[in-house]
């Protein structure tokens, strides 16, 4: 145990109940577990991975599952919490992310396979941490990502020239094919 953990409820979203522990004592870990458990659900503990925070929308727009342009999330002090997701004007989203073509292609290939492997073959958004050496870690797959006009999936779609209305139609069409 090196004190670097992420503690979070298994079924929450938007970083609710999430604790990033950088140099935590065992007592601080126990406290984070207890707070995360207040929602009455299973708590997850993960390695705290440092790097650039990226996210990738993966959608089937009628031609098979494809990764959209990568988005880099630049939150103040690297803390992309609930406040910085929904209320801050300081968080910056760079789409497409400024990542080498080689790393971009590797990330896109891996997220497409990851989405298919969990049955998210219509749409999802996958969070990725990019390390300084070019290696990366998939953090989680969000199978029901935000879909407001200001959410990250529509941002990636707009970068490809796809309107919000067209995106919603395509996601709904894929859902009705499965339903």
Regions found by a protein language model. Name each.
Residues 72-124, 155-179:
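Active-site "cap" helix and flanking loop/linker of ATP-utilizing ligase/carboxylase catalytic domains
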């Amino acid at each position: 145990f090196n004190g670097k953990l992420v503690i979070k409820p298994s079924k929450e979203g938007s970083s609710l109940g999430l604790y990033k522990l950088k140099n935590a004592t065992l007592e601080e870990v126990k406290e984070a577990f207890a707070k995360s458990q207040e929602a009455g659900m299973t708590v997850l503990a993960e390695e705290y991975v440092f790097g650039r925070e990226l996210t990738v929308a993966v959608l089937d727009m009628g031609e098979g599952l494809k990764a959209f342009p990568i988005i880099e999330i630049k939150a103040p002090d690297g803390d992309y919490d609930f406040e910085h997701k929904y209320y801050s004007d300081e968080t910056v989203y760079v789409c497409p992310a400024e990542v080498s073509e080689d790393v971009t292609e590797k990330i896109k290939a891996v997220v497409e396979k990851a989405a298919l492997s969990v049955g998210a073959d219509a749409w999802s958004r996958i969070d990725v941490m990019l390390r300084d050496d070019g290696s990366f870690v998939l953090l989680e797959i969000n199978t029901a990502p935000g879909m407001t006009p200001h959410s990250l999936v529509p941002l990636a779609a707009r970068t490809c020239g796809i309107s919000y209305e067209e995106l919603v139609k395509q996601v709904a069409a894929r859902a009705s094919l499965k339903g």
